[in-house]
């Protein structure tokens, strides 16, 4: 009986004066959003630091990450979320914002083969013309459910490095993937 009375009193309080509950929920949502923004900024900073190390380590001209997302009309799209480049390379990040994945053959190739090392024109002639890279090393980024969420790539304007450290690249990719999934 006491429980019923408490429920009735609590219900009346909510019915006649719900604003404290709404205010509390709003504050909770705002705090949660702030924490997510801080975590995202920290993760992005760590990813940029890793990419800077990898750009030097693999002697690339550009290193980048394209992240997949749903576009305006619910088409599968991608955006170049991260791009670092050396002094002789021009940025291309803004050419790859909200583009439809079907415009290029590279995403489909990676969906089937998971990675690519070689001449860019062999896998995607359109990309080789539009961003001046002759060679690329790239790998599909997958989440923990094995769903494709993006592409990690290193671009070379003239030639691939003489010594490719494929085992290092695989280990570095795993480290980067963990950060992307934070």
Q: Which residue ranges define each predicted feature?
A:
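Juxtadomain coupling helices with adjacent low-complexity linkers
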Residues: 29-32, 150-182
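A short, aliphatic-rich beta-strand micro-motif
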Residues: 134-143
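GAF sensory/regulatory domain recognition
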Residues: 66-97
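Short regulatory alpha-helical segment in sensory/regulatory domains of signaling proteins that mediates
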Residues: 50-62, 67-70, 177-180
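Membrane-aqueous junction of the first/signal-anchor transmembrane helix
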Residues: 1-42
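Acidic/proline- and glycine-rich, intrinsically disordered low-complexity segments
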Residues: 85-115
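Short linear interaction motifs
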Residues: 43-49, 132
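Signal-transducing coupling segments at domain and membrane junctions
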Residues: 113-134
